[in-house]
Amino acid sequence: MSSRQRAVCESVPTRSSAQLADQLRARISKGTLAGGSFLPSERELAREQKVSSKTARRALKLLESEALIVSESRRGYRVLSRANDPDRGCPIAMVIANPPESGDRSFYGSLLGALQDAAGRRGWSLLGVQREGRPIGEVVERLRAARACGAVVDSLDTELLEAVRRLGVPVVLADAWFADSPCDAVVQDGFAGGVLAAEWLAGRGHRRIAFLGPDPRGADMLVVERFSGAVGGLARSGLALDPGLTAVTRQGDPDAAARCARELLSRADRPTAVLALWQGFAREAARAARELGLAVGRDLDLVGWTTSPAPGAPEATGAAGPELSAEVVWSPADLAELCILRLMQRRADPRMPASLTRVPVRLEVRG
């Protein structure tokens, strides 16, 4: 064979695009090409692997069709976490970004337990990651090291969310949401709950109905939705929320909530019913009523908000025990199941549009 013939033979690609894709797929599966990292450009890959640019391009497109990588404008192909298989021990991560307030511990405990149950039914594991006191880079590195296959996050911190998404990890917001969010979210149906509670009180003949809760001004969307539901429920019943009977303060401040509740119920023209649609606020309203000698059900009606018990657990009595007329009830188990379902869908098709899913609520009358 002449030197010219030898050169021509050596320039012909010796591998197909499918073979190159197999090699890259194996490296992604083993984690040597980590989620969030970028592959070499088509030209660099062709040169490294001694294949034509066309072969490299076809291999990359094949991996993209399998949702193992995604093309990003002017940056190249980023590795996704789809190769981090939960059936092979890669965990789902629950990133708790906001430390639980004293009144919210039951929420976080219920949600973590529900996620563990939902993952366990599929034979999967759950990794809990606390954000408090840790830089974002440390949280992201923990997810990378564990090869998390998806992340359930409770935060509205856009910097944290973007850092996790850059790993190629599917992200679902759990009971957190903001307008134009690039992430899927699963939330309690606060609007429907507010409507149910307000309509129930109006149906019992109440006309002086108070609202006790977080200040909706500048609040997150879930606070605004619950407040708006209460206003809408009254409007459907031909009533309006009296500004003079609207007691709002900062969420997570039990002392401020206690002051608001006591001031509301100690006035000469006190309300005959109170919408306290957060556990902490319902607790303080019930305490204030008790200290003022008012009996719930006789002197006023009080509607709160609570979680339904896990299967096999004792029946829930809510934030204020039996001292409530009714409660809006939602299921952490349903929220957890929908979060995992959405992660599975996102893993299968990373290009789906972001969605907002609402967990149904119901009104339960006490006593």
Predicted features by range, described:
Residues 9-13, 34-37, 70-102:
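N-terminal helix-turn-helix/winged-helix DNA-binding helices
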Residues 18-22, 30, 42, 84-141, ...:
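Amphipathic helical "hinge" segments at domain boundaries
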Residues 23, 258, 262-367:
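Flexible loop/turn connectors
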Residues 31, 66-67:
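Glycine-centered, phosphate/nucleic-acid-interacting loop/turn motifs that mediate DNA/RNA or nucleotide
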Residues 93-94, 147-155, 210-213, 268-281, ...:
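Periplasmic-binding protein-like
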